[in-house]
Amino acid sequence: MNVLRKRILTAVVLLPPLLGAVLYGKGWPFALLVGTVAVLCAGEYFRMFFSTARDRWSGVAVTGLVYLFGILLPFRAAGAAVLCGVALAAFHFLAGEESPVERARGAALAALGAVYIGGFLSTYPRTIDLPAGDRWILLGLVSVFAGDTFAYFVGKRFGKRPLSPKISPGKTVEGAVGGLAASIALGTGYGALFLPGVLPGFVSLASAVVGMAGQAGDLFESLLKRAAGVKDSGTLLPGHGGMFDRVDAVIAAGPVLYLLALLAPLAGGRG
């Protein structure tokens, strides 16, 4: 079975439970699902950069705490708690027998992983609690996955100019443009059907911004993997690699999507 078929089969298997969780799993079921994804991603992230079980499990634990702070505490308090948690993590990773440079590198990587994975993913349970939050999350997923899919096919068919050859040689400018166009088109179409009270222009803008955030997240994860010297973050999902490989764009889009869902009423959107 080739890679494309594996990717399609994996997507078909995962799509129904994902849709069910978004549409019918508000509250703790949805938060638990996203938290599970955060833990899996954190496990892959810390396995890429740290060799000892102590550092890996400590990183996963801090990421989990950051995620819990993000979903349980009021917004400002959550920010302060996240900073405290990251500071404690940094102190933990600074301790050890390695050289000061290595320990400082470890502390920085731990703080980055905890905030990027745990903090960014914590915005999804917050988003689903907003008015029409489940539909906004689906808009984000449509924009991200449409952009990812079309960027792949457009890039393979028409791609000539490398987008970032030192980070991800396979990505092209043409693929990125095609992916962004797909994010806008499919996101706008989705909004017309499921967010009829929101201004179409705002939905198109939201789809574009989320699509760009998703592409940035994809490139950022490619940068992390290149820095770690690995091709995939893991082997959990056939055809995709690891969980972090599959949701890299979703992670980056989380805070942007949350902000857009908050701003929708101010832009005349009722959801």
Predicted regions and their residues:
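Re-entrant/interfacial helical elements at transmembrane boundaries that shape
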Residues: 156-157, 225-227, 251, 256
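Juxtamembrane interface at the ends
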Residues: 152, 222-230
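Interfacial loop-to-transmembrane junctions
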Residues: 227-250
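Juxtamembrane boundary at the C-terminal end of a transmembrane helix
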Residues: 259-271
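Final/C-terminal transmembrane alpha-helix of multipass membrane proteins
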Residues: 246-262
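Membrane-embedded alpha-helical bundles of polytopic integral membrane proteins
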Residues: 1-208
